[in-house]
């Protein structure tokens, strides 16, 4: 707040909300509990240089293997309830930021819930769980280049970021200096 005022700016902020029954990934637990929303907003209003632009939560959609499609999570319902709660109090927000599993096929679902913003994430590379068969509009376009760090009990391990565990990758192409050809292998997750 003080930095925004010093810079002569009003900084738009998103408020992350959650409810006790929501699904949170380990290490990503954060936000303000929905039932304290009005108290939190009252405190934000006391801070000059800040403007509550919207609400967010994560993950709002997830691939459901049994249903064979992306479905809303309880988090999305919490987010929509928080938006409605604010609207009933006369507080309009400009953004409903609804990240996770965004793709061409999930955009209509996001629109049904009034989402204004989403994140493309793995849809940009076509590596979303919904695209395991390559039948979605997004094209698989990702090369993950790494090196083997060590071998242990018949398995090879590698370093490097970018591997998406929930992406259900099953195969890899391996090129070794000793073997000047590409070898297909199975992945363990």
Per-region residue spans from a language model:
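A conserved acidic, glycine/proline-rich C-terminal tail/linker
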Residues: 184-189
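Active-site loop/helix belt of alpha/beta enzymes
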Residues: 19-134
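Catalytic beta/alpha-barrel core
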Residues: 1
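Short beta-strand segments
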Residues: 14-18, 159
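Conserved AdoMet/S-adenosylmethionine-binding subsite of the radical SAM
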Residues: 9-15, 23-24
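Active-site loop ensemble at the mouth of alpha/beta enzyme cores that anchors a bound cofactor
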Residues: 102-180
């Amino acid at each position: 707040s003080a930095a925004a005022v010093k810079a002569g700016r009003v900084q738009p902020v998103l408020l992350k909300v959650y409810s006790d029954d929501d699904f949170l990934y380990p290490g990503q637990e954060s936000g303000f509990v929905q039932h304290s929303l009005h108290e939190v907003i009252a405190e934000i209003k006391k801070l000059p240089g800040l403007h509550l632009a919207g609400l967010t939560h994560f993950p709002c959609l997830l691939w459901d293997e049994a249903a064979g499609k992306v479905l809303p999570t309880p988090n999305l319902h919490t987010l929509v309830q928080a938006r409605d709660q604010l609207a009933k109090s006369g507080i309009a927000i400009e953004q409903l930021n609804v990240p996770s599993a965004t793709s061409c096929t999930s955009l209509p679902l996001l629109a049904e819930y009034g989402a204004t913003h989403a994140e493309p994430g793995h849809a940009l590379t076509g590596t979303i769980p919904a695209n395991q068969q390559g039948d979605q509009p997004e094209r698989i376009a990702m090369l993950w280049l790494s090196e083997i760090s060590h071998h242990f009990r018949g398995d090879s391990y590698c370093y490097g970021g970018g591997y998406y565990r929930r992406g259900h990758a099953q195969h890899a192409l391996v090129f070794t200096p000793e073997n000047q050809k590409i070898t297909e292998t199975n992945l363990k997750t």
